[in-house]
Design a protein with these regions (language model features):
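C-terminal catalytic domain of Rieske-type non-heme iron oxygenases
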Residues: 1-241
Length: 241
């Protein structure tokens, strides 16, 4: 359905993280952190997410992009949602499209993405649904493998322990982009980043480079918390955990 067989590694970043590999990967197993960690409390940033658990070792979340924040006192218009989505693309992309009467911002933005990526890769993506195009769809396969098979968020994660220090780990981040059936392109050499290096050094990550900085900047503090906390275990929330 996602045609994973016809993907190629376009970007590969390997970063050393100042936290145990298991704790590092748990940071990417839920979407509840998005509102504060990634969005600074901005409107429309509440993650509308469903979680599924499959036996024996697979789970999935689907975070719908461009959905209404259920905690907002009043629902935004589709045009307001469209402006929020368009803001991701930057000023160089031109004026924000108008959402026609009866249409949704999600559907309009998905068509923009399919057209843009179709021109970039010289391929037809019209068969992709709005959800397949826009949404953050993550499958986790125990113990350390994640894949996002969507069109605009095409990531693969792998987390590995540091063999010399259990308080550090390695995070391999890949972007899998579409390729024509039968084509063969060698994968790029990984860009290796140390703990204090920014993901924005990788041009291939685009605007997501800054997002990954936000996702991992608090991990050293997490390790310190593990070492100093008097509790014997974790405290889990009753929502999205």
């Amino acid at each position: 359905e996602f045609d994973i067989a016809n993907r190629r590694i376009e970007t590969h970043v390997c970063k050393r993280l100042p936290v145990n590999w298991n704790a590092a990967e748990e940071a990417f197993m839920e979407a509840y952190h998005v509102k504060e960690t990634n969005a600074g409390g901005r409107d429309f940033s509440e993650p509308v997410t469903t979680y599924d658990v499959y036996p024996k070792n697979v789970n999935r979340f689907i975070h719908t992009v461009g959905s209404v924040n259920p905690r907002m006192p009043s629902a935004p218009s589709e045009q307001e949602l469209m402006r929020a989505l368009w803001g991701r693309r930057g000023p160089a992309e031109g004026d924000c499209p108008t959402v026609p009467e009866g249409a949704t911002a999600r559907d309009v933005y998905a068509e923009v993405i399919k057209k843009s990526l179709g021109e970039q890769y010289d391929m037809d993506f019209s068969q992709y649904s709005t959800a397949q195009t826009l949404d953050s769809i993550e499958y986790f396969v125990f113990p350390n493998f994640f894949i996002f098979p969507g069109l605009s968020l095409p990531m693969v994660y792998r987390f590995r322990p540091d063999p010399k220090d259990p308080d550090y780990s390695y995070f391999d981040l890949y972007f899998l982009r579409p390729s024509e059936p039968g084509s063969s392109q060698p994968p790029p050499e990984p860009m290796r980043l140390d703990v204090k290096d920014s993901y924005t050094l990788s041009e291939g990550l685009g605007f997501l480079g800054a997002v990954y900085d936000q996702d991992t900047d608090n991990m050293a503090a997490q390790t310190r918390g593990f070492k100093t906390c008097a509790k014997g275990g974790q405290t889990l929330g009753n929502y999205q955990e």
